[in-house]
């Protein structure tokens, strides 16, 4: 029992904690792109926290469309500025926000794996209640933690027209099974109980069940060598939804957990992660030293987007 508590506490330290900027990652902003504009737009979550978001756009964006972007665990929406800018440069207006417990948003912690779906539900409820967005065609694009919510959101908001889910886990339970395999299998029950108690309404959603009876146009993108959201999630979705004409699958190779990146970007990102882990062990580093460390990497190359994948994404989003 003592060891079980340690395991659960270790899991809490990853999935039930706050994620703030500790200056060991670089984040692009709208100011890094000429003519790129943003407008602050915060909303209250059902948990009572203020979630900070922004509308991003270029001049002459499509006024009949809105894309909501849902980020992965921890780093907040600015970790996806390249993706957001890519969507906006194609003519879309994008609303992106930081989840509960992340960066600019309130909350003592991220409140577990299902919180992204809870937040996205609150986000869309807010948008739908705002007259300035009345009648808009709304799509959702998400990655990882944000792709779990993207995969399941049509069960809560059937009017969503299109989704693009990149590297999304199909359910909280399936992810717990993968985190706690082999000798750790015995701790699944305790961890799943934690997730259920943290988010009883949203922790039982399963993407196959959510999409089976949905007419949302869906593009589900995975990488065959993803070690975080493994190939099995793709296989579960493919087996359960392959007969659905509104759902399309894209499986790429050698992209790890970032299927929309170039292969070179994925390799550079792995080099950075190893260097960051080594740098983080140094004690009492100064702000200047951290800035110098980050400046030694080519962040444009490290976040370079794969044009072939984006052609698929835009073909899906643009489809009438």
Model-derived segments and spans:
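Short alpha-helix in the alpha/beta-hydrolase fold that links the catalytic acid
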Residues: 216, 230-240, 264
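Conserved alpha/beta-hydrolase
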Residues: 84-106
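C-terminal catalytic histidine-bearing segment of alpha/beta-hydrolase fold enzymes
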Residues: 245-320
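Hydrolase active-site cap/lid region
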Residues: 10, 152-200
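An N-terminal hydrophobic leader/cap segment in hydrolases
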Residues: 1-44, 51-54, 276-290
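Short beta-strand/loop motif that positions the catalytic acidic residue
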Residues: 214, 220-222, 226
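The serine-hydrolase catalytic nucleophile loop
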Residues: 73-85, 99, 232
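Alpha/beta-hydrolase active-site loop
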Residues: 110-131
């Amino acid at each position: 029992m003592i060891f079980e508590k340690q395991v659960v506490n270790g899991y809490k330290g990853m999935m039930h904690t706050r994620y703030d900027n500790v200056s060991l990652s670089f984040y692009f902003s709208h100011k890094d792109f000429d003519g790129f504009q943003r407008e602050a737009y915060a909303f209250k979550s059902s948990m009572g926290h203020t979630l900070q978001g922004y509308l991003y756009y270029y001049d002459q964006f499509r006024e009949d469309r809105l894309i909501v972007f849902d980020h992965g665990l921890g780093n907040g929406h600015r970790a996806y500025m390249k993706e957001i800018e890519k969507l906006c440069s194609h003519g879309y207006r994008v609303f992106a926000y930081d989840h509960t417990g992340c960066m600019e948003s309130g909350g003592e912690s991220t409140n577990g794996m299902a919180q992204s779906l809870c937040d996205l539900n609150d986000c869309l409820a807010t948008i739908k209640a705002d007259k300035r967005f009345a009648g808009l065609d709304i799509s959702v694009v998400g990655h990882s933690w944000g792709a779990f919510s993207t995969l399941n959101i049509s069960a809560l908001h059937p009017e969503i027209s299109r989704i693009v889910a990149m590297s999304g886990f199909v359910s909280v339970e399936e992810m717990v099974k993968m985190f706690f395999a082999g000798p750790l299998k015995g701790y699944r029950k305790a961890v799943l109980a934690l997730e259920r108690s943290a988010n009883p309404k949203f922790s039982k959603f399963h993407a196959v069940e959510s999409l089976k009876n949905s007419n949302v146009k869906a593009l589900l993108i995975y990488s065959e060598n993803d070690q975080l959201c493994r190939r099995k999630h793709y296989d579960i979705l493919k087996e359960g939804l392959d007969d659905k004409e509104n759902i399309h699958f894209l499986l790429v190779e050698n992209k790890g957990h970032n299927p929309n990146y170039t292969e070179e970007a994925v390799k550079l990102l792995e080099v950075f992660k190893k260097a960051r882990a080594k740098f983080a062990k140094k004690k009492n580093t100064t702000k200047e030293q951290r800035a110098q460390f980050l400046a030694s990497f080519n962040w444009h190359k490290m976040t370079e987007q794969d044009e072939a994948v984006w052609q698929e994404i835009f073909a899906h989003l643009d489809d009438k």
